[in-house]
Design a protein with these regions (language model features):
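Cytosolic regulatory regions of ion transport systems
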Residues: 1-179
């Protein structure tokens, strides 16, 4: 029997609370096929019309995830909130499945370390990350701030007065600000 071919433009989002549902909706708006999973039937029903596929499932049940073909998805986001055990076990199962890219939401730095150890490729700490971002915006001229790695960030800012109406070369921004 030939293996069914799927688009790589698919993702499974596990946990449909505020973070997971926002992320899933954004993926759908970017034409990504999204399988939204949660153990809370009310949340699943709330998003049934907006996501490509939804199901009520205990994400720590490996066989249930297999029946939903989660192992065939190239990308997964573990957006589970306060249940650390479910977050860790789910991430581990996805890693065992061989999911190519696993993002996981962590509630603390220690939780983040554990998620990385059990197979998460990318870990986000939403409240921590957003707090840093807003602090940079509050401090000054920045309109937006996104940190990529420890030493690299992308910043949208107002142009300094001395740069307005000049070319980049004339303004000497590179030498003055080290950019």
């Amino acid at each position: 029997m030939a293996k069914k071919e799927h688009s790589d433009n698919r993702a499974v989002v596990i946990g449909l609370g505020r973070f997971g549902s926002s992320l899933a909706l954004e993926l759908v708006s970017g034409n990504t096929e999204v399988l939204g999973l949660d153990r809370n039937e009310k949340l699943v029903n709330a998003w049934a019309d907006d996501l490509t596929h939804v199901a009520v499932v205990d994400s720590t049940d490996e066989e249930a995830l297999r029946q939903l073909n989660v192992h065939e998805y190239p990308r997964a986001v573990v957006a589970i909130g306060a249940d650390l055990e479910a977050s860790i076990l789910t991430t581990s199962i996805l890693s065992d499945f061989g999911v190519k890219k696993i993002w996981a939401k962590a509630l603390s730095r220690q939780h983040a370390k554990i998620l990385e150890r059990v197979g998460a490729h990318h870990v986000v700490l939403p409240e921590h990350d957003m707090g840093e971002r807003v602090a940079h915006l509050v401090m000054g001229r920045m309109l937006d701030y996104i940190e990529f790695e420890d030493d690299y960030a992308m910043v949208k800012t107002l142009a300094p007065r001395e740069a307005v109406g000049r070319t980049l070369g004339e303004s000497q921004l590179r030498s003055k600000y080290g950019i």
